[in-house]
Amino acid sequence: MGMRMMFTVFLLVVLTTTVVSFPSDSASDVRDDEAKDERSDMYKSKRNGRCCHPACGKHFSCGR
């Protein structure tokens, strides 16, 4: 293959990868939003005054 042909194939691969990544990126944004809407276990345990996670364990008792 000549240099022009190799460059053309390279451009096609780059453009195809870019076009395919846009729809999957927006789908992952929706999943991120859904995950943020649900409250985490760590947050729930903070509301009850208990937390066994190392990040909040120094502020709350584990309750075990």
Swiss-Prot record:
One of its GO terms (cellular component) is extracellular region. It is found in: Secreted. Alpha-conotoxins act on postsynaptic membranes, they bind to the nicotinic acetylcholine receptors (nAChR) and thus inhibit them. Keywords: Acetylcholine receptor inhibiting toxin, Amidation, Disulfide bond, Ion channel impairing toxin, Neurotoxin, Postsynaptic neurotoxin, Secreted, Signal, Toxin. Expressed by the venom duct. InterPro entries: Conotoxin_a-typ, Conotoxin_a-typ_CS. The modification Cysteine amide is found at C62. The modification Deamidated asparagine is found at N48. Disulfide bonds join C51-C56, C52-C62. One of its GO terms (molecular function) is acetylcholine receptor inhibitor activity. Residues 22-47 form a propeptide. Belongs to the conotoxin A superfamily. The cysteine framework is I (CC-C-C). Alpha3/5 pattern. This is Alpha-conotoxin CnIC. It comes from Conus consors. Found in injectable (milked) (IV) venom. Residues 1-21 form the signal peptide.
